[in-house]
Amino acid sequence: MTVFAAEQQFHDAERPLPSHQARLACRAGLAETTAGVAPGFVQGNLAILPEKYAAAFHRFCQLNPKPCPIVGMSDVGNPMIPSLGIDLDIRTDLPRYRVWRDGELVEEPTDIVAHWRDDLVAFVIGCSFSFEEALLADDIPIRHIEEKVRVPMYRTNIPCEPAGPFSGPMVVSMRPLKPKDAIRAIQVTSRFPSVHGAPVHIGLPQSIGIADIAKPDYGDPVPIGPDELPVFWACGVTPQAVIAAAKVPFAITHAPGLMLVTDLKNKHLAVL
């Protein structure tokens, strides 16, 4: 597991970090997509499981680092993850959550205080929103940000390596790009292996099991121009699919596109 130390900098209660401001907004009830929120700061997907299943899920993430790169993990029963942020409370600091029972989605609350238990372990998994900042800095347009919608995500026929009860296909996120931008995007995102890295597929969505690219399994559809290619990255929503398939008695995840904003800096995730 790779856990990055939170950015060390002075914190003034009157001038909180943009990332902390984002979490406080969520705590106050804001429930919107976090794409483009708090530029420069790492965002994460969330998976919360009973301790009984935590070791197997951790192993699943280790075996599948492209869709499931761990950037932080809580102690058992502790909703605070200080390595990821000041005053970060996993129960309140995301815009919206999903509560699962026996593999079925039963609720989508804006906080999980009433659902928290002493046996729960929270995993924060890297999110492609982190490398989007680098793409934008390279003048590569990102359609879902332009359209102000959630990134489209799809179940594929790409199998993940199983671990314990957890198995299933990879989920991918898609961004339409012109060929020259797609080539540059490969180069840019290869520098960020801890937030999914380079694309796993370009073009021909049918070859990875996507029957209709206009109908994403998660998120929102975006237009694809006639001179553009769909570019697919491994996605941190993959754990939701495998947790649902495993039918564990109880689990909590984030709502797709509504992420945890941490105090980690995107620039510190780059390897080159």
Curated annotation (Swiss-Prot):
Keywords: Lyase. Its EC number is 4.2.1.-. Pfam families: D-Glu_cyclase. It comes from the Bacteria. It is an enzyme of class 4 (lyase). GO terms for molecular function: lyase activity. Belongs to the D-glutamate cyclase family. NCBIfam families: PRK05463.1 (NF003969). This is Putative hydro-lyase Rpal_1947. The lineage of its organism: Bacteria, Pseudomonadati, Pseudomonadota, Alphaproteobacteria, Hyphomicrobiales.
